[in-house]
Curated annotation (Swiss-Prot):
Gene that encodes the chain: frr
Domain of life: Bacteria
BP term (GO), one: translational termination
InterPro entries: Ribosome_recyc_fac, Ribosome_recyc_fac_dom, RRF_sf
Family listed: Belongs to the RRF family.
PANTHER family: MITOCHONDRIAL RIBOSOME RECYCLING FACTOR PSEUDO 1, RIBOSOME RECYCLING FACTOR
One term of GO molecular function: ribosomal large subunit binding
Name used for this protein in its record: Ribosome-recycling factor
Organism name: Clavibacter sepedonicus (Clavibacter michiganensis subsp. sepedonicus)
Pfam families reported in the protein's UniProt record: RRF
C-alpha cells in the first residue's frame, strides 16, 4: 500500500463513518413523522421479511402523520401489523382499506431530552470511529516508514489530522442540527 492509498482509504472510511452517524440520526424520532424512521421496518410478505420501502410508498400530509400506501393491497394487513410493532414510537395506526395512517403523539420534554442523550451517544460513537480510522491509518504509515521518507510520512500524518478534524466537525454539525430538531416544539 502506498502513502496516497493510505490517505485515500482513510478519507473514504471516515466519510462512510460520518454517513453512518447521519443515518443513525435519521432513525431517532423527532416531533415529526419521517419516512427514515421506517427504513429498517421489516414486513412479513409471502413468508419472507421484506423492507417496508419495497412494499409501499410513504408521504407526510402533516408533520406528525405518515401515510403508507402499499403497492399491493393484499399486503395492507401485514404492513399495519409491522407498523404497530415498531418499538419506542407509541403511535396510533389506522387502516382504511386503501392505506395505513400512522400518527405520532407529541413528544414530552422528558422524552425529547432522552432522545438528545441517545443522539449524543451516537455522535460520540461516530467520533470514536473516525479517530480509530486515523489510528489505523497511522499504523499503516508507520509500516511504510522504511520505504518512504520521514518528510512524506510527516506530511501525510498532518493531512490525516486535518481529515480527522474535518470529519469530527461534520459529526458535531449533524449533532447540533439533530439536537435543534429534537428540542423544537
Amino acid at each position: 500500500m502506498t502513502v496516497a492509498e493510505v490517505l485515500a482509504d482513510a478519507r473514504d472510511r471516515m466519510g462512510k463513518a460520518v454517513e453512518a452517524v447521519k443515518e443513525d440520526f435519521g432513525s431517532v424520532r423527532t416531533g415529526r413523522a419521517n419516512p427514515a424512521l421506517f427504513q429498517k421496518v421489516m414486513v412479513e410478505y409471502y413468508g419472507s421479511p421484506t423492507p417496508l420501502g419495497q412494499l409501499a410508498s410513504m408521504n407526510n400530509p402533516e408533520a406528525r402523520t405518515l401515510i403508507v400506501t402499499p403497492y399491493d393491497k393484499t399486503a395492507l394487513k401485514e404492513i399495519e401489523k409491522a407498523l404497530v410493532n415498531v418499538p419506542n414510537l407509541s403511535a396510533t395506526v389506522g387502516n382504511d382499506g386503501e392505506m395505513v395512517r400512522f400518527t405520532l403523539p407529541e413528544l414530552t420534554e422528558d422524552r425529547r431530552k432522552e432522545f438528545v442523550k441517545i443522539v449524543r451517544g451516537k455522535a460520540e460513537e461516530g467520533r470514536v470511529s473516525v479517530r480509530n480510522i486515523r489510528r489505523r491509518s497511522k499504523d499503516e504509515l508507520d509500516a511504510l516508514k522504511g520505504e518512504v521518507g520521514d518528510d512524506e510520512v510527516a506530511r501525510v500524518e498532518k493531512e490525516l489530522e486535518a481529515l480527522t478534524k474535518t470529519h469530527t466537525d461534520q459529526v458535531d454539525d449533524a449533532l447540533k442540527r439533530k439536537e435543534t430538531e429534537l428540542l423544537e416544539v
